[in-house]
UniProtKB/Swiss-Prot annotation:
Self-association state and partner proteins as the record states: Forms a complex composed of PxpA, PxpB and PxpC.
Source organism per UniProt: Serratia proteamaculans (strain 568)
EC number: 3.5.2.9
Species lineage: Bacteria, Pseudomonadati, Pseudomonadota, Gammaproteobacteria, Enterobacterales
Record's protein name: 5-oxoprolinase subunit A
This protein's encoding gene: pxpA
Function description: Catalyzes the cleavage of 5-oxoproline to form L-glutamate coupled to the hydrolysis of ATP to ADP and inorganic phosphate.
Biological-process GO terms, alphabetical: carbohydrate metabolic process
GO molecular function, one term: ATP binding
Keywords noted in UniProt: ATP-binding, Hydrolase, Nucleotide-binding
Keyword Hydrolase: yes
Catalytic activity: 5-oxo-L-proline + ATP + 2 H2O = L-glutamate + ADP + phosphate + H(+)
Length: 245
């Protein structure tokens, strides 16, 4: 069994370089919610150093609130903003001798695209226009995955080690009870359940089906590095290989 481990980088966390030695894919902030040209370049260099797949992490234009503000923008505006961000990272990666291989939206752009078909289509069209070989990462079973498939893109269905799930398979919104899993033991159990058995226990106590092709590890968590190491060790015991596939 093979699974991808991804982490969001270039967002001002001190753990980036250490975390890159434990994951297989990096989602690099492209300046709209965090990061700038220098952090993008450094993140790309580290990813190349450790053999980690380079991906863009585009966002709504919302640096003040770290890309977590709900926005209702015209589809063509989102399309242009995503193309702009992907183009920037693709150019930096190419200049450093690498190549961008995937795209994972950030924050509220990601969450809204999971349930809003028009927004999801705008993102998928932008990805295809920049490079139709790019992989599109989205919440497992979401509208973004469907949009990517409709556009003929390779998709990667994502699950979260440290987030609570609602009965419909979407994430519990940040700020609500149960949104974040702070226990490493519970996060590990949830991750293994999703990877092994393709299901997750929701806050209501029911099971929701999920396809775990890539697992997100948040680098800004209280015990992010410790958990990442523990997860890699447990995967090895379980015979689960980590690769960007």
């Amino acid at each position: 069994m093979i699974v991808d481990l991804n982490a969001d980088l270039g967002e001002g966390c001190a753990n980036d370089q250490a975390l890159l030695q434990l994951v297989s894919s990096a989602n690099i902030a492209c300046g709209f919610h965090a990061g700038d040209a220098q952090t993008m370049r450094q993140s790309v260099r580290w990813a190349l150093q450790y053999g980690v797949a380079i991906g863009a992490h585009p966002s709504f234009p919302d640096r003040e609130n770290f890309g977590r503000t709900r926005m209702q923008l015209p589809a063509e505006t989102v399309y242009a903003q995503v193309v702009y961000q992907l183009g920037a990272l693709a150019a930096i990666a190419r200049a450093e001798g690498g190549v961008m291989v995937h795209v994972k939206p950030h924050g509220m752009l990601y969450n809204q695209a999971a349930v809003e078909p028009e927004l999801a289509q705008a993102i998928a069209r932008a990805v295809k226009a920049v490079d139709p070989t790019l992989r599109l990462v989205g919440l497992a079973g979401s509208e973004l995955i469907r949009a990517g498939e409709e556009q003929g893109l390779v998709t990667r269905q994502e699950v979260f080690a440290d987030r609570g799930y609602q009965a419909d398979g979407t994430l519990v919104p940040r700020g609500q009870p149960g949104a974040l899993i702070t226990s490493d033991e519970l996060a590990l159990a949830q991750t293994l359940e999703m990877v092994r058995h393709h299901r997750v226990r929701t806050l209501s106590g029911t099971w929701a089906a999920v396809q775990a092709e890539t697992v997100c590890l948040h680098g800004d968590g209280e015990h992010a590095l410790e958990y990442a190491r523990t997860l890699r060790e447990r995967f090895a015991v379980e015979g689960i290989s980590v690769s960007a596939q």
